[in-house]
């Protein structure tokens, strides 16, 4: 059977690294008594559009917890330069077809709506010329806009397809009139968008990605998606269909989630 006639399968992969500079042992830290990675995996199970789901980790303790809970675990190397490189290893281990789609679900977002996972997958399916898809949301306040930890994205409409032009930790786009004025800045520009770290990839891209050296802008910004743009790939992008609740980066984030009602994690 030719590849054009073969069905396209969708795989959800949850990368889970134990090492974190801001919050050590993050995947195994508990929310209402359950390791965070298991909350995330249970959310992934609600995404009924996917053919399968697995957790990718380089740590035996994470693998043990996930396997004992009944989840598929793939052990990966510990020396990957980025999460995308790790997904490429998973795709190779699993032997997924080049035309299949991989959805990267962050392991520190236990409240992510499954709707967003489906949206990013559908976005890639609908743009045959893009090798990757992601989501964004408007930035309303100026402090968020200028913060380096918030990744900004600018995009353009090409042939009725919205595609990313550039991602940056810098405040882009720049409103020239505001920058040159003496007034205090209180809000972000109208076209300011925050990039959400949710991706869908074609396996064929992952196969190429690992053979590309890290690019100058990728290294400068520490943003792996720039490697795709610098190598001429198109990244489809759309405004998220619903809000993405904040994930867990710090102990304060973890405390906030533990203070929430248990039903917030159990609802569809």
Swiss-Prot record:
The keyword Cytoplasm applies. Belongs to the KdsB family. It catalyses: 3-deoxy-alpha-D-manno-oct-2-ulosonate + CTP = CMP-3-deoxy-beta-D-manno-octulosonate + diphosphate. One of its GO terms (biological process) is CMP-keto-3-deoxy-D-manno-octulosonic acid biosynthetic process. One of its GO terms (cellular component) is cytosol. HAMAP family: KdsB (MF_00057). The gene is kdsB. This is 3-deoxy-manno-octulosonate cytidylyltransferase. It is found in: Cytoplasm. Its EC number is 2.7.7.38. Keywords: Cytoplasm, Lipopolysaccharide biosynthesis, Nucleotidyltransferase, Transferase. Pathway: Nucleotide-sugar biosynthesis; CMP-3-deoxy-D-manno-octulosonate biosynthesis; CMP-3-deoxy-D-manno-octulosonate from 3-deoxy-D-manno-octulosonate and CTP: step 1/1; Bacterial outer membrane biogenesis; lipopolysaccharide biosynthesis. One of its GO terms (molecular function) is 3-deoxy-manno-octulosonate cytidylyltransferase activity. Pfam families: CTP_transf_3. It comes from Psychrobacter arcticus (strain DSM 17307 / VKM B-2377 / 273-4). Activates KDO (a required 8-carbon sugar) for incorporation into bacterial lipopolysaccharide in Gram-negative bacteria.
């Amino acid at each position: 059977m030719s590849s054009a006639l073969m069905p396209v399968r969708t795989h959800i992969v949850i990368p889970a690294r134990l090492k974190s500079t801001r919050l050590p042992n993050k995947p195994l830290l508990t929310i209402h008594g359950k390791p965070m990675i298991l909350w995330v995996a249970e959310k992934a199970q609600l995404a009924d559009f996917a053919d399968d789901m697995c957790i990718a980790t380089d740590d035996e303790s994470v693998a043990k917890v996930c396997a004992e809970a009944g989840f598929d675990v793939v052990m990966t190397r510990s020396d990957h330069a980025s999460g995308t490189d790790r997904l490429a290893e998973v795709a190779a281990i699993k032997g997924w077809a080049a035309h299949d789609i991989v959805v990267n679900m962050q392991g520190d977002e236990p409240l992510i709506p499954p709707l967003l996972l489906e949206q990013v997958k559908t976005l890639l399916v609908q743009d045959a010329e893009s090798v990757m898809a992601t989501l964004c949301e408007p930035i309303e306040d100026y402090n968020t806009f200028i913060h380096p930890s918030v990744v900004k994205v600018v995009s353009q409409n090409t042939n009725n397809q919205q595609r990313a032009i550039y991602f940056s930790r810098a405040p882009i786009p720049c409103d020239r009139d505001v920058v040159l004025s003496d007034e205090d800045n209180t809000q972000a520009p109208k076209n300011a968008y925050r990039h959400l770290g949710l991706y869908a990839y074609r396996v064929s891209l992952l196969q190429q990605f690992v053979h590309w050296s890290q690019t100058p802008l990728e290294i400068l910004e520490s943003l792996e998606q720039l490697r795709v743009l610098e190598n001429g790939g198109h990244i489809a992008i759309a405004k998220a269909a619903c809000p993405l609740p904040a994930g867990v980066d710090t102990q304060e984030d973890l405390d906030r989630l533990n203070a929430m009602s248990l039903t917030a994690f159990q609802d569809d």
